[in-house]
Amino acid sequence: MIETGVIHGRFQVLHLKHMEYILAAKMRCRKLYIGITNPDSMHTRDSVNDINRSAKSANPLTYFERYEMIRGAMQEFRVPESEYDVIPFPISCPEYILQYAPKEAVY
């Protein structure tokens, strides 16, 4: 088991497959950082893979709404709060990721 792991996703809207992904990652580390991509409009750029991915219509929920959904789901799955954290993950601006996520983690 590794000490610290980081995963990321948009989580627009959080669903069971997202939870399978999150819980599978949590099983592999003591502390998991769950990164929310496209946390705000300043850190969102057009995706070369899917031009609709960064559209406002494809991102109806705010960072805070997604944060609350993830925390609520983690409580429902009985994951202790001390074993995870939910963070912004500005995937479109990779130079800022380490402002939010630990450098020494496994990504």
Task: Give the location of each predicted region.
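Nucleotidyltransferase catalytic core that binds NTPs
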Residues: 1-107
